[in-house]
Amino acid sequence: MNLKTGEVKIHGTLPFDLYVEESDDFDDRINNITNIRHWCASRVLSLDRMYAKEILNACNFTQAATDYDKTQIALQYHCLSLRDCYWIKMEKSENQSWKTLNLFHHSLSDAMVDISLKGVPLTIQQTELAAPDCSSQGVAPKAWIREKNMLYLLKGELPGSDAVRKEAEASAILRELGFDVISYEKTVYDGLSATKSACYTSEHCNLISAAGYMENEDIQELFQTKPELEQKFHQMNVADYLVGNTDRHWGNWEFWYDDDRELRFGKLMDFNHAFEAVQETKNLPYQSVYRRIVSQEEAALESFAKAGLDTAGWEKIDWTRYWYGEYVKERVEKLLQS
């Protein structure tokens, strides 16, 4: 693609969240430029991320706010991300290949962990080493590490919060209840409390957020053709209600897909705002999918009847083992009595 003229030649499958056209029409080409810049920009952290400025400064990147400026940043590390295997080669003559850039196999920077997780002011020479941390979304401090050839995400917490305990406990509770959830374990990195979770993407497993999918596709149509995905959606609404998760926006529930691009519902993730919901808390996914504004409890009661959950062991759980056990117990009982 030519970012100046908008000319595009499509040689293979594109990301779900990128739409461009092979066209000589002026408006189509303007749209191509806008869309590719938006896609590139989506692979750059937001400035509200804790230590975002330290991360950008370490790589000598500008503190960009516009899609144009973010695109210039993303292109410096070829738009690499651990979300998928898409990347950008700037020129045909450029001496780079997927083999030389593949984040799933290459080394990570120990310095980036100190910058991304603790805000230590350091400098990074190889911008590709910053790609995993520069492209990770969310506000909480986080950093990628490699242990025994496995990738893990360390996720800290904002000052004064209890996010690490909340995320680890919500994950443990939901797994005990039988939900398909990312495992977050409490750990300590250089004296800093954090959760640790294994990377769930790979060279053959990509992710697309619901927000990204809905940029170009109709999610209700997807649910009609794949009812098993809608059932998983209902399970998510129940899970978020049970642990009082207030941060389930359309950017942090996901679909996974392999090389065949067959979509499946991703494991539930991101629980650092668990146990914060109150009676009036709204369910944002319902609003995104069904265009209805309902409370988290109303959505859960509706979804509970459609989720196909095995609740046989729910009443036998010893809630005293959990710091937030009583909170969840009350919500479990309300659903079981519905």
Predicted regions: what they are:
Residues 1-238, 242-245, 255-338:
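Phosphate/dinucleotide-binding and metal-coordinating scaffold of catalytic cores
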Residues 251-253:
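Conserved protein-kinase catalytic-loop position immediately C-terminal to the HRD catalytic Asp
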